[in-house]
A protein has these predicted regions:
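Alpha-helical support elements that line or immediately flank enzyme active sites
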Residues: 3-16, 70
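Non-catalytic C-terminal accessory modules of carbohydrate-active enzymes
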Residues: 17-152
C-alpha cells in the first residue's frame, strides 16, 4: 500500500513528478501480470524485504485515485484541472471524460499537444462553482453545461 499511498499524497500536494514516480514503482514492482497488487516484492527489486505474492485490490484503487487527483482536484465548490501533471506528460495529448466530482460536477478535460485545454462541466445539481485554473466563478442549474477553453 505504501507506494500507492505516496502517489496519492504527492498528487494531492500537486507534485506530479513524485506521484508519477511512486505510481511507476508500484506498477513495476508490486503489480502482477494480471494487474493485481501483489503485497510483496515478488520481482525482488530490493524495495521490500517481503517477497510473497498474496494479492489484494485496495492499493489498485489508491493508484487509480492518485491518477484522478493528478487530473482533477476539488475543494468545497472549487475545482482545478490538471493540477499535478508530471513533466513527462507535458506537450502530450491528455484527456479524461465524465469524471464525477464530489462537489456536484461531471467534468471532461481534453488537452492537445500544444497545451490548449478544453474543459466541459455538467452540473449534477444546481450550484455555484469556482474554476481555479481561470479564477472564474459560474452558476449552473442541474443538467446545464459550461465549457472553458484556455492555453496552459
Amino acid at each position: 500500500f505504501s507506494y500507492a499511498w505516496m502517489a496519492l499524497l504527492q498528487a494531492i500536494c500537486r507534485n506530479g513528478d513524485k506521484a508519477e514516480y511512486y505510481l511507476t514503482l508500484f506498477q513495476d514492482v508490486f503489480t502482477g501480470p494480471n494487474g493485481f497488487h501483489l503485497n510483496g516484492d515478488f520481482k525482488q527489486k530490493g524495495v521490500s524485504r517481503y517477497t510473497y505474492r498474496p494479492f489484494t485490490l485496495e492499493a489498485n484503487f489508491l493508484a487509480a485515485e492518485a491518477i484522478q487527483h493528478m487530473l482533477i482536484q476539488t475543494e468545497g465548490m472549487a475545482f482545478e484541472v490538471l493540477p499535478a501533471v508530471p513533466a513527462s506528460w507535458k506537450g502530450k495529448r491528455l484527456s479524461c471524460f465524465d469524471f464525477r466530482t464530489d462537489n456536484g460536477l461531471q467534468i471532461s478535460v481534453m488537452r492537445d499537444d500544444c497545451n490548449h485545454v478544453l474543459v466541459r462541466c455538467q452540473a449534477i445539481y444546481a450550484g455555484e462553482w469556482v474554476f481555479r485554473n481561470l479564477n472564474q466563478t459560474f452558476s449552473l442549474n442541474a443538467g446545464q453545461v459550461k465549457t472553458f477553453s484556455y492555453c496552459a
